Amino acid sequence: MRRYVQNKVGKCYLPRLYCVTKDPRSIVFDTLPNKFVVKANHGSRFVRVVTDKRSIDVQSLVSECQGWLNIDYGQCYGEWGYLGLKRCLMVEEFVESSYKDKQGVPADFRFFVFDGKCALIWVDIGRPPSARNVSIYYPSWKQVPITLGYPPTEGPLEPPADLRAMIALAEDVARRIDFVRVDLYSTPCGPLVGELTMTPGAGMWRFPNKIDHLLGKKWKLSKGL
């Protein structure tokens, strides 16, 4: 993902990378800053956000990371994009943002992009132990009155100051792809790309009919699925 984004829009739109490894025991935690993120490249939810390095149990984290690497995630839900990947761990910078949960973890702005055009923005705030809140917006920032199993954010959420830049970045990254979800962070220095996924929710999310039809009409395929 990082190589694709770098080639498409430039390295400046990616969080700083500290380490890439196939063996979590090789991570030199003493050289890392107090805040960082560890994640695997071959599945969903394989991520650990560290906001205070002094409070972590290193051996427990190493064991957790090894557990991720042992899972053939592509076989779990039949997601072709994860099949056959050379599994690895990445240690990245902790991204600071004014849109964050109570632990300081930045919100995910998830852009549903069809052939280079943003159709929907899913704002996801909160990782355990914080509560998770999800609100969904059109690109105009009009809120879509639906929930998908999570409560919406409390009160109206102000659009990020760099919303237009975020939409433009998501569309540039997704250009010439029939569909991809582009996950961004809003930072004081501009948007950063956190993740790309071709099959959000393993393709099993149930949207209300109105939104399902809206998204379906925007998905133009030369051949049927």
Regions found by a protein language model. Give the residues of each.
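A long amphipathic alpha-helix within ATP-dependent nucleotide-binding catalytic cores
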Residues: 84-90, 135-193
